């Protein structure tokens, strides 16, 4: 659970305009939410989905931001926020029979990954 996005122990980068459907990315994000930083990297490296590459880059960016900006060791990080939002839809038309045109929608996504220092009770 993320305490606050402005907390000194939280780093939340955003990967915008990823040319992939949000539903395909959501399937990957559900697997890493709540896992440790190192475990989420291992999961993403071995999952067979194309959505793993942009999510892996976002997780690595979150870890680098936490280490550089907040001074938190990467071994102490937990993926506390993993969400995907709809980006703009690119609309194209495909020529069809008898002069018709069918609409093709190319979806984009915005990925937010939040990592925070692990809280031990």
UniProtKB/Swiss-Prot annotation:
GO cellular component, as recorded: chloroplast; large ribosomal subunit
Subcellular location: Plastid, Chloroplast
Major location (coarse): plastid
Superkingdom of origin: Eukaryota
InterPro entries: Ribosomal_uL22 (IPR001063), Ribosomal_uL22_bac/chlpt-type (IPR005727), Ribosomal_uL22_bac/org-type (IPR047867), Ribosomal_uL22_CS (IPR018260), Ribosomal_uL22_sf (IPR036394)
Stored Pfam families: Ribosomal_L22 (PF00237)
Name recorded for this polypeptide: Large ribosomal subunit protein uL22c
């Amino acid at each position: 659970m993320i305490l606050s996005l402005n907390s000194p122990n939280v780093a939340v980068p955003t990967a915008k305009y990823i040319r992939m459907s949000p539903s395909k990315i959501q399937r990957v994000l559900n697997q890493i939410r709540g896992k440790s930083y190192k475990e989420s990297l291992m999961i993403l490296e071995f999952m067979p989905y194309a959505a793993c590459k942009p999510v892996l880059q976002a997780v690595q960016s979150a870890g680098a931001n936490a280490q550089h900006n907040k001074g938190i060791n990467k071994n102490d990080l937990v993926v506390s926020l993993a969400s995907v939002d709809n980006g703009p839809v690119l609309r194209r038309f495909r020529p069809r029979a008898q002069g018709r045109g069918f609409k093709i929608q190319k979806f984009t996504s915005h990925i937010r990954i939040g990592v925070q220092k692990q809280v031990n009770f």
